Amino acid sequence: MTEIEFGQPLPSNLDYAVSFGIPTWDSAIGYAEKVPEVIGKMATGYPRYFPQPPVQRLCAYFVKKFGRGSENCRPFPSVNLGLKCFEYVKSVSGPESKAHLEVETVTIKNRGAKTSKEPAELVLTIAAVLASEEEFETVKEYWKLRGECVSSRLALSVNQLLDCANHGSEQVLRELEAGVFAAKKGEEKAKNLIKGRIVENRFRPFGLEKKTPNWEGLNLNPNEDVYLVSSGMSAISTARNLLTFWEEKKNSGDSLNKTTSDQKKKPLLCDTVGIFGFPFKDTQVIMTKFGKCKFFGFGNSRDVVELQKFLETSKQRILAVFVETPSNPLLNMPDLKKLRSLADQYGFFIVIDDTIGGLNVDILPYADIVSTSLTKLFNGASNVMGGSVVLNPKSSLYPYAREYFRSANFEDLLWCEDAIVLERNSRDFEDRTLRANANTGILLNDLLLPEEGKICKKIYYPTVTSKETFENYESVRNERGGYGCLFSVAFFNEGDAKAFYDSLKVFKGPSNGTNFTLACPYVHLAHHSELEEVSKFGADPNIIRVSVGLEDIQWLLKVFSSALDVVKSRGSKHS
């Protein structure tokens, strides 16, 4: 059953579901406009935006114990992260801030320890920032953008342990403790397997050795060059933090390559990055909230020229250019070779988000950092959050990056139970990628593309978005790689878009890369308050974004054909 009520877990029988039902166009608009009658129906939501039930319960615990008046809170999995949020809120609110940071610890005993090498106990620490009204909006914004949230599995464990400590039996406590220690015991193995899988995916996608000269001398060590974080957004924010670390180190007396003349110079620190192409919304927001951002929203050859003009004429540098390969939701592909050339010429870094392209594209040789959401296709099952940061050892950033990840600036906070689930779900990543590629190609070529210009206004996919995108994509496509599972279809008017969406009998909600087909009116969900502005970059408000799953292709053709028939029956006139 793909009919999921608004605000309910999607699918309905999935524990820790990261998506939720948005079954109709009107419910999507109501959600985007924060209509109380709509928002009030939400039992769960996308975890960075709306705490899932276990996290809601943990918030309630903090509010009851530490709250003042009408406060609410957001919890973090370490004191350091909670403190960073607290300091950010104070920087926004000023000296009048009434937000406060509260910390709760739960100590559990390893009663089953068999050797002295095993820890005798484990301390779980949760740091929550509590605030009311406008300040709480700032807390929520930070929690959403940084992506360093308490996971639902961690929250559930903490809730159960707190309950047991207050009024539980000794036997139940022992069982809970044993469960956590069993997961902690499997944590290192799971994370090592994930890191090894990520490296294998880079060097031998679909089992084929790299043959391109770009890989000459490029080797990855899974223990030194791959880092796991708690979400894809955390991977982006970690990359941004690393750039600031590099800039501060380079311009301080602690520079790794300092000279006497260097120490005499005290240039102003650069906090500007570029975004090349129209990206996932939160990527742009985080760059503007925590620094400065120069936006090249088309991400095409003309923007390459504009970027070069900016670099030649502007008095300020840029730290890096962030790109998506391809972009979400317009599936544009930048010219990575030209961007790499400019980066080398003008001394900036390239950060690539390859969440959408995944195994299909060979992008590491062009990147200094690769940030990926493992929540999406890598995981597939849509029941766990995670992200990764991969370093290019040939980058001039690399020695600073290694120092950053060894310092207190970085904490490995991917919860053990999440790592175990993520490892298990990702074992068939290659096979699922090939199957999703095939389903998407058939669905587009046999059904939707023949309707482009007739029923559909425009289809966005690496093969058809534009000639330039296709050529750029082909230049980095892996030998067995396809074009991905994500496409967007724009309709001529809102009525047609609404008719198609409401009648489409697949799961409908946010996220992508799921094993099941998932659709949403993406531009409204992400940009409803700025439709006119984003339309300048091709983000049509009548776009439906579709992530194609692993269902039987004949079933997919049938349900999409039925939805198209509903649009045809409207008889809209398209000039």
UniProtKB/Swiss-Prot annotation:
The keyword S-adenosyl-L-methionine does not apply. Its cofactor is pyridoxal 5'-phosphate. One of its GO terms (molecular function) is O-acetylhomoserine aminocarboxypropyltransferase activity. It is an enzyme of class 2 (transferase). Keywords: Amino-acid biosynthesis, Cytoplasm, Methionine biosynthesis, Pyridoxal phosphate, Transferase. Disruption phenotype: Decreases growth during sulfur-limited conditions. Simultaneous knockout of MET17 results in an inability to utilize hydrogen sulfide for methionine metabolism, and toxic accumulation of hydrogen sulfide. Its main location: cytoplasm. InterPro entries: Cys/Met-Metab_PyrdxlP-dep_enz, PyrdxlP-dep_Trfase, PyrdxlP-dep_Trfase_major, PyrdxlP-dep_Trfase_small, Trans-sulfuration_enzymes. GO terms for cellular component: cytoplasm. Induction: Induced in sulfur-limiting conditions (at protein level). Pfam families: Cys_Met_Meta_PP. The modification N6-(pyridoxal phosphate)lysine is found at K376. It catalyses: O-acetyl-L-homoserine + methanethiol = L-methionine + acetate + H(+); O-acetyl-L-homoserine + hydrogen sulfide = L-homocysteine + acetate; O-acetyl-L-serine + hydrogen sulfide = L-cysteine + acetate. It comes from the Eukaryota. Belongs to the trans-sulfuration enzymes family. MET7 subfamily. This is Homocysteine/cysteine synthase. The gene is HSU1.
